[in-house]
Design a protein with these regions (language model features):
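Short, solvent-exposed loop/turn segments at secondary-structure junctions
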Residues: 37, 103, 138-139, 161-162, ...
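Aromatic-lined carbohydrate-recognition surfaces of secreted/lumenal glycan-active proteins
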Residues: 127-142
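Substrate-binding cleft of extracellular glycoside hydrolase catalytic domains
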Residues: 1-28, 32-121, 125-130
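Flexible, glycine-rich phosphate/dinucleotide-binding loops
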Residues: 39, 71, 140, 163, ...
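Structural recognition of alpha->loop->beta junctions
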Residues: 81-98, 143-167
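Functionally critical loop-and-helix segments that line ligand-binding/catalytic clefts
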Residues: 1-13, 19-20, 24, 147-209
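Short beta-strand/turn micro-motifs composed of small residues
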Residues: 66, 135, 158
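A short secondary-structure junction signal
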Residues: 109-110, 143-146, 182
Length: 209
């Protein structure tokens, strides 16, 4: 299949002109940040609600991701509780990814971190979502036991210009892309699976937490 062109955005892109994004014809889907982290505490991305509504109204396939820095069970529970509240009533056509890159996560062993990520991903699946793991190549190589996460598609960031050899469902290939309707540089990815079709066939994407 021809890779899907996927954009990911958060509060840092400000108010986006979604009509201009759609008219550009350069984007097949959008990953929205649902939760960020401030001083180790999860908080809802202030642009998530608006962007989700705008993409849904325009028929733009949408997925999401949340930033994790949980190193304890209590922190994982707090993140998932905040995520549940933010996702209530939402429907997605792309995966919901766990963003695993925070330096604090390196305090865990690769195996322990993978176990924590797998537990969170399993929770996403109980909510009827297509669970995915996001990280970057060096983190995957040194801090995360990827062999324990093969049940979940990988969204891999690698900006060296060549598609990574590590198996992945999406490749984030730049952080300096440009898309009409958005001020400043943005992250761009290529999805190598037809996630809207996969979610549709499996009946996934309508949050049921």
């Amino acid at each position: 299949m021809t890779p899907l062109r996927v954009l990911d955005v958060s509060r840092w892109q400000g108010c986006i002109d979604w009509d201009a994004v759609q008219r550009s014809g350069t984007i097949d889907g959008v990953m929205l940040r649902v939760l960020g982290s401030r001083n180790g505490q999860p908080y809802p991305d202030p642009q998530f609600e608006r962007s989700h509504a705008a993409c849904t109204a325009r028929g733009i396939p949408v997925g999401g991701y949340y930033y994790t820095c949980a190193v304890t069970s209590r922190q994982t529970k707090a993140e998932l509780n905040a995520l549940r509240a933010a996702l209530r009533g939402k429907t997605f056509q792309l995966p919901l990814a766990i963003d695993v890159e925070d330096t604090r996560l390196r305090s865990l062993s690769p195996a322990a971190l993978a176990q924590r990520v797998a537990q969170a991903a399993a929770q996403l699946e109980t909510w009827n979502l297509y669970a995915m793991v996001y990280t970057y190549t060096d983190f995957a190589d040194t801090a995360l036991a990827m062999d324990a996460l093969t049940a979940y598609d990988l969204w891999l960031a690698d900006y060296r210009g060549k598609r990574p050899t590590r198996p992945h469902g999406m490749w984030q290939y730049t952080s300096t892309g440009h898309v009409a309707g958005i001020d400043g540089p943005v992250d761009l990815s290529r999805a190598y699976k037809d996630y809207p079709a996969l979610c549709r066939r499996a009946g996934l994407g309508r949050f049921s937490g």
